[in-house]
């Protein structure tokens, strides 16, 4: 399996790639669901998968600099979802750290639960960010990658 700038090439089913803005989140959810079906995801897994994808994509377009790029492909029996934006997290390791057996974070503010939800649904969630912080975050990039079982 060959690699490219986005990671492993899909095995058999070509990747789907779309730019997402706040106004296009609904269309992105529909595309993700159709892609998951086309790539062989068990139908009962699709609703939760779309919830996780929506949470990460919504974060990208509301906290990063829109538009965000949503990419979906198949790799070794998993559905792989990558969301990239032009934002910068100071410490992306905090996104994937933590005890998933802990209760849902109870904050007295709206929001703040999307990453926790996505981490509990996905098989894996990784996040990384790049920026020349010595100069500015103008060239920053954040990538969140989720893997979901197809069956």
Q: What kind of region is each of these model predictions?
A:
Residues 30-54, 107:
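Conserved short strand/loop->alpha-helix "switch" segment adjacent to the catalytic nucleotide/phosphoryl-transfer site
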Residues 1-15, 61-151:
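Conserved beta-strand-loop-beta-strand hairpin that lines the nucleotide-binding pocket
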Residues 27, 48, 117:
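Charged catalytic carboxylate motif
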Residues 15-30:
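STAS-typified acidic loop motif
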Residues 52, 57-62:
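Short, well-structured hydrophobic secondary-structure segments
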């Amino acid at each position: 399996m060959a690699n490219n700038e986005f990671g492993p090439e899909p095995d058999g089913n070509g990747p789907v790639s779309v730019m997402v803005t706040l106004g296009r989140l609904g269309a992105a959810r529909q595309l993700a669901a159709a892609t998951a079906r086309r790539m062989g995801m068990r139908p009962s897994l699709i609703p939760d998968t779309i919830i996780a994808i929506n949470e990460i994509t919504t974060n990208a377009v509301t906290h990063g600099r829109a538009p965000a790029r949503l990419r979906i492909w198949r790799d070794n029996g998993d559905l792989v979802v990558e969301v990239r934006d032009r934002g910068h997290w100071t410490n992306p390791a905090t996104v994937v750290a933590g005890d998933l057996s802990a209760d849902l974070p109870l904050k007295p503010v709206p929001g703040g639960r999307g990453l926790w939800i996505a981490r509990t649904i996905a098989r894996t969630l990784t996040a990384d960010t790049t920026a020349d912080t010595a100069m500015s975050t103008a060239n920053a990039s954040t990538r969140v990658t989720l893997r979901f079982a197809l069956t």
